[in-house]
């Protein structure tokens, strides 16, 4: 259960706001937000990808407003697979991810609560956030939540359809092997999701 440290499951983001510090008109630049598998919680890994004239791609670290290079970024649920979607109507990014509430639990106690792997692997709480810039995230609410850790809702994907946000995710119930190896796919609808912006 203890995979090596690393990054995986990238989300590709293009910053279109010309006032965003990471936006540039000079080159085609994309940002990769990746799940950070570190044993910790609420961080993601960040790469910048610059597409050259010959279509080759050059990866590099991004910089903070102070000029320091940045590799990891505070990110709600960045320790498990997450999904970012951009809403052109409001110009907000939306994030669907798992919420950690108990990551400081002793590993020896995990079998008592049916948690899979490490203490940070809480998969039974699926949360929604919004942001103007993919850095400052505002909590919008819970998409799905259970007190039973076997009932996972994880590995989300989302699409905007009209006024609603549709989310599908790998899910589990009492018939699943564990919260990681799921036996269902569930569909969740956040109706009028733009009204959650405050």
Question: Predicted segment positions?
Answer:
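Transmembrane beta-barrel architecture of outer membranes
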Residues: 79-81, 123, 153
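C-terminal structured interaction module
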Residues: 150, 155-159, 166
